[in-house]
Amino acid sequence: LTLGLDTVLGGQSLSPYYTMSKSDYHTDADSVSIGMGVGGFFTVGERHSFSYGYSYSDSKGNHNSSDDTARETNSIGHGYTFNHDYIFTEIISTSIGLGYSDSDAIVDAGNDYETYDFSLGVNLSFPWAYIAISNGMSFNDYKKEDSSVASDRLRSDFTNTFDIMLTKAIGDILPAIDQNRNLFINLSYENGISEATTFNYDSHSDSFSLSFTKSF
């Protein structure tokens, strides 16, 4: 279930929302998740725009005969975001994002953590193509040692994600099949590196995607 509202108040766009989901498993503990929050957006002059958000989550799992530890990961979460976009020229714009979230579970070990996010992006609106380049960093700091992994080491994770996307009108390449230039090809590449103080969580990934979109 999702309920949302978009409105304008005091020159700002506001979007409060509420979500609820429930999973009934035949052979595992049932789970219920409730979330709510609000997002806001406003501009300053013609070049600056700001967005922000707050989110709250409450996740619960019930004990049953098949899973008598589900309740241990019941958690309350709070999240905050703030973003700034700036238009340098008709071609170049930038975006900076900050985020913080906190999760508190019944059993602290391996479940309680704080997350700090930072991202930087550059958008290039060339006449011949649109290119978006961004890099995001995320730091996870756990609050208590997880004895099932390393009882003498407090886990801390660092994740760096770099991606680049190119969008181009098919009509620039094959005008015969896209005379109105409203069919686009999208190419993207993403590189993700995750490092942790416990090597069990180290990873490195690369992904590529190709898609087509059409506007009417």
Regions from the PLM with identified roles:
Residues 1-216:
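Gram-negative and organellar
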